[in-house]
Amino acid sequence: MRSMDRFGIWVLAILLVIQSSFGFYLPGSYPHKYEVGDYLNVKVNSLTSIETEMPFSYYSLPFCKPSEGIKDSAENLGELLMGDRIENSPYRFRMFKNESEIFLCQTDKLSADSLKLLKKRIDEMYQVNPMLDNLPAIRYTKRDGYVLRWTGYPVGIKVQDVYYVFNHLKFKVLVHKYEEAANVARVMGTGDAAEVIPTIGKKDSDVPGYMVVGFEVVPCSFAHNGESTKKLKMYERYTTPIKCDSTRVSMSVKEGQSIVFSYEVSFEESDIKWPSRWDAYLKMEGSKVHWFSILNSLMVITFLAGIVLVIFLRTVRRDLTRYEELDKEAQAQMNEELSGWKLVVGDVFRAPSNASLLCVMVGDGVQILGMAVVTILFAALGFMSPASRGTLITGMLFFYMILGIAAGYVSVRLWRTIGCGEHRGWMSVAWKAACFFPGIAFLILTTLNFLLWGSHSTGAIPFSLFVILLLLWFCISVPLTLIGGYFGAKAPHIEFPVRTNQIPREIPAQKYPSWLLVLGAGTLPFGTLFIELFFIMSSIWMGRVYYVFGFLFVVLILLVVVCAEVSLVLTYMHLCVEDYKWWWKSFFASGSVAIYIFIYSINYLVFDLKSLSGPVSATLYLGYSLFMVLAIMLATGTVGFLSSFWFVHYLFSSVKLD
């Protein structure tokens, strides 16, 4: 009865986590009330493209600049690492004031270099990403009877070898009447940099106000009369009507020609409430396919893992039960006729080769796995919303640094266990644990950063941020890892249940290479996550929104279970054929899933990112994929090793073999 109650509790918990993946989030900022006539300032993020994966500053192209100068918005660590550069723009509106034919500016005449760069950005399908009140602009297009939803709009378009630029923007701002229950101060400005303005002489309830709940844009290419705009100043009305037709283009770009930019804006009252304003971004097309595919994958993998677990437990338990039922004389006689895993009793806990490296990798794997579990759990509960840009990356860095204490503890305690309680060398192991994975990651990211620096991309990590990351590494992560190592050195080591012989036992020749089975074992864990992996890759490289962290958390838990089971089965199989070198094999039995993920990444590059242009972009993609695969290998390998270590210790402590 108790087991049924526990099962029901676990099922309820899983269902609650899955339910949280239906776009639930904590908004990340307070609703901002704008009175009629208040100014709304549009901001712009970096130019992005799925063809190059290299973001560039909005003002790297000949666009209009604000009269007060270009100002960067305050950005967190995660935004900078993601390549976001949010800046002010000259586009401004007045709340609930529809305006049309607004002249923005006339650029200088295009030089040969400016024209070449503009054409290159159009060829590479770069998108402009305006933002209002922290909401990215959405663009709707119709194709084959379907309505497609995009964020941002293209810089321009190429038609029959002629380049056209989108120089007139038609904005629509959806607003919802301010609700008194929100009880927020009147603010003026955008969502991520709002200035609080006290309301003097009147209460909020006396002042009608609105909240921004939607932001749409329609880009148009309109050929302005350059001569008639020379005397116009910014925000003055254009002399003739402008018809914005997104199906036609007329503003071609040529050397020695200037570009005139203009815009119009309309406001529309909407039933969308402020907490639901991100639903349009979170509910992307293909969601039904996503849900059913994930559910089907979970059912199949759970069923298969259950069968493997049942067969495995029955086999081992039957072996142990038969031994325990014998009397002492029969046990002594049976000990003389040992077979299978019982023959390696004197070698099963023999120290593996490169023991310190194994300890370091297991410690780093615990740190990475802990970071992933905590971060995804917080995201599934809604604490890391898309409204708060960069919080996911910032949270990952924070949890990774804090969990350095776990890496040091596990590495050193495992080192002392393998060394039968030896204290010498624990400081070296702790240092290696603090520097192994971060050092490799730093090497990969530095190499990729040089490529981004050479391309003048905003995705390049600034030197000041490099210094901050180094300080976080050596001033927080390393000391915490050493502290964890100290506690690991003070903690009692795990006693082995059997003694190790002085002379190693010879391993019988195998019919097939044992490492071949180890590498093949990664297919089962890969089957648990390859569907989810597609959506994650699409989010990273195709600019799609990913916010089903509830399902991702369930998949992560399932992955941990399957990795443990696969490693247990392979360890038992190796022991049965008298192969006692299980340490590294148990690690790579589950860690080999990283190989299949890297192969999948290459497949995704070839078939899904066909438009990715240039060796620099491909190198960036493969470099980031290698970084991701290394982290996955350490995390999954750690799960397999720790489960196998527990199993072997339990197996040989359950029966006395001398």
Curated annotation (Swiss-Prot):
Residues 24-291, 386-391, 454-462, 537-547, 608-619 are lumenal. The chain crosses the membrane at residues 292-312, 365-385, 392-412, 433-453, 463-483, 516-536, 548-568, 587-607, 620-640. It is a multi-pass membrane protein. Pfam families: EMP70 (PF02990). It is found in: Endosome membrane; Golgi apparatus membrane. Belongs to the nonaspanin (TM9SF) (TC 9.A.2) family. This is Transmembrane 9 superfamily member 11. It comes from Arabidopsis thaliana.
